[in-house]
């Protein structure tokens, strides 16, 4: 069985948190995109759709969470919060797709431009 490992290092003010997750994953290719499909610990389906310039992570929560990353460009995240659906700006500073690995570094900020946290996400599978 193929496994996916998602290791996210989050810098929030002076706090550093590392989230390390391992799931069974299914890999599919369709057109120019590759897809990683798995279920998280909440039993929500998660789909990561990616190619060289773009990655979209959709979590089928209720309502669903959508994060879009663009190489060298800002993009949007739609994240459900206790205050309802919130739109965040994602500033991606590093995005690299390897053979069985994706590296992402990004900042999340609200629409007013107030930074929320810094993230370094490493996704590996195989």
Descriptions of predicted regions:
Residues 1-65, 72-74, 78-110, 114-116:
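N-terminal intrinsically disordered, cationic/polar leader segments
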Residues 118-126:
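Flexible glycine-rich active-site/ligand-binding loops centered on an Asp-His dyad
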């Amino acid at each position: 069985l193929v496994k996916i490992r998602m290791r996210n290092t989050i810098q929030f003010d002076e706090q550093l948190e590392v989230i390390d997750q391992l799931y069974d994953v299914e890999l599919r290719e369709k057109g120019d995109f590759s897809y990683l499909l798995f279920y998280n610990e909440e039993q929500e389906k998660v789909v990561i759709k990616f190619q060289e310039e773009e990655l979209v992570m959709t979590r089928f929560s209720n309502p669903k969470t959508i994060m879009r990353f663009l190489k060298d460009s800002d993009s949007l995240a739609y994240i459900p919060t206790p205050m309802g659906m919130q739109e965040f700006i994602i500033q991606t500073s590093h995005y690299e797709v390897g053979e069985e690995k994706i590296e992402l570094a990004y900042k999340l900020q609200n629409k007013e431009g107030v930074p929320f946290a810094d993230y370094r996400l490493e996704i590996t599978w195989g």
